[in-house]
Amino acid sequence: MGVAQSNTTLVAPQPKGIIDPATGKPVGSNDPFFGEINNELADKGFLVTSTDELINWARTGSLMWMTFGLACCAVEMMQVSMPRYDVERFGFAPRASPRQSDVMIVAGTLTNKMAPALRKVYDQMPEPRYVISMGSCANGGGYYHYSYSVVRGCDRIVPIDIYIPGCPPTAEALLYGVLLLQKKIRRTGTIER
């Protein structure tokens, strides 16, 4: 009727990687990305990456965009900042000054009189700078393509990184364009674009 005693010492297993103090479990234990990082940290004690990957990772999480709303597409551009879509959760926050912006969203019809102002604002943005062309009018003139006063695509004035089609494109389409831009930034090196 006695309890058998063992002479072996019981040792609690050591958790691997970065431990969340609130739960006591490894951070992101269900996420494959964090699982890979935790395994590498537990194995080596440090992470190995290139400077390009680190800089591009930081860029994608802190993109500041400047609005260049010219027509009805600007309403959808404003909607993407509202709580339903909340683009700021992806590290994409609005700024009012071109000197603090990384991304310019051209939304709407670009006229010949507005084209020099667009180029001037683009030139004031620091490098690296990116441009999203939003809507049919910004992409190729749209409904006003044959008008004498409309530029047939803002790519004639500034280089475009992402085109978002639609008249007007939905907020989901703009959000998808932002995610594509982040993917493009992660894919490129820091020296060449």
Swiss-Prot record:
Q: State the Gene Ontology BP annotations.
A: aerobic respiration; electron transport coupled proton transport
In this chain, [4Fe-4S] cluster is annotated as bound at 72-73, 137, 167
The cofactors it requires, by name, are:
[4Fe-4S] cluster
InterPro entries linked: NADH_UbQ_OxRdtase-like_20kDa (IPR006137), NADH_UQ_OxRdtase_20Kd_su (IPR006138)
Entry GO terms, CC: plasma membrane; respiratory chain complex I
Primary localization: membrane
Reaction(s) the record says it catalyses: a quinone + NADH + 5 H(+)(in) = a quinol + NAD(+) + 4 H(+)(out)
Q: Domain of life here?
A: Bacteria
Q: Does the keyword Cell inner membrane apply?
A: yes
Q: How does it sit in the membrane?
A: Peripheral membrane protein
What remark does the entry make about the cofactor? Binds 1 [4Fe-4S] cluster.
Q: Which EC class is this protein assigned? A: translocase
| Keywords of this entry | 4Fe-4S, Cell inner membrane, Cell membrane, Iron, Iron-sulfur, Membrane, Metal-binding, NAD, Quinone, Translocase, Transport, Ubiquinone
Q: What subcellular compartments does it reside in? A: Cell inner membrane
Q: Does the keyword Cell inner membrane apply?
A: yes
Provide the E.C. number(s) assigned to this enzyme: 7.1.1.-
Disulfide bridge partners, by residue number: none
Sorted alphabetically, which SUPFAM superfamilies does this protein's record hold? HydA/Nqo6-like
| GO terms for MF | 4 iron, 4 sulfur cluster binding; iron ion binding; NADH dehydrogenase (ubiquinone) activity; NADH:ubiquinone reductase (non-electrogenic) activity; quinone binding
Q: How does it assemble?
A: NDH-1 is composed of 14 different subunits. Subunits NuoB, C, D, E, F, and G constitute the peripheral sector of the complex.
HAMAP family associated with the record: NDH1_NuoB
- Homology family: Belongs to the complex I 20 kDa subunit family.
Q: Output this protein's name.
A: NADH-quinone oxidoreductase subunit B
Q: What is the lineage of its organism?
A: Bacteria, Pseudomonadati, Pseudomonadota, Alphaproteobacteria, Hyphomicrobiales
- Give the gene symbol: nuoB
